[in-house]
A protein has these predicted regions:
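N-terminal glycine-/lysine-enriched basic segments
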Residues: 1-176
Length: 176
């Protein structure tokens, strides 16, 4: 009567499986772009020219699935990656890949009867421990040479790009 299609799932596992299927479709497309050896992805939106990109966010933004429950998984993971972009300025592709891994593993525990609330508490505790460990082992950098070395690695070992980035960071200051 309202023009809304409703599909009833007899159990949460069926619904979770559909959502995870959508997450997998998104993560498979996006993960191909990850890292220095990431691959280009060709996107051909209906009625528009194709786009070739190695940017995971661009790939993610074009993905919309016809199945509403699979698309729900896509939209939730896109939201998580957008929050990563807003907070960190980068890392969106990595956040999509990590979110998929977390959901896959969580599904195993939920299927075995673990409470989703307890699972979330465990994930939160693990995240705190990871952040604490990273903070403990982090090595502060300050010199232009250290910045150049790191930037060079990030630029596929192109020393000239590393030097340019180090100079720019030095001029902008540590807080930009």
């Amino acid at each position: 009567r309202y023009g809304v299609s409703v599909k009833v799932y007899d159990n949460g596992l069926s619904l979770n499986t559909k959502i995870l299927t959508g997450v997998n479709k998104l993560a498979d497309a996006v993960s191909a772009t990850l890292g220095p050896k990431g691959k280009n992805v060709v996107i051909h939106p209906k009625g528009r020219n194709p786009v070739i990109t190695k940017d995971g966010v661009t790939v993610a933004n074009f993905i919309e699935l016809s199945d509403p429950f699979e698309n729900l998984g896509v939209q939730v993971i896109k939201q998580a990656s957008q929050q990563t972009a807003a907070q960190a300025g980068d890392g969106t592709t990595t956040s999509i890949v990590l979110a998929r891994a977390m959901l896959r593993e969580a599904q195993k525990y939920i299927s075995a009867g673990v409470s989703p609330v307890e699972l979330k508490r465990g994930m939160d505790k693990a995240a705190e421990d990871i952040v604490s460990h990273i903070t403990d082992i982090a090595v502060p950098i300050s010199s232009e040479q250290e910045i150049e070395d790191i930037a060079t690695i990030s630029a596929n070992n192109d020393r000239s790009i590393g030097k340019l980035i180090a100079t720019a960071v030095d001029k902008a200051g540590k807080d930009g």
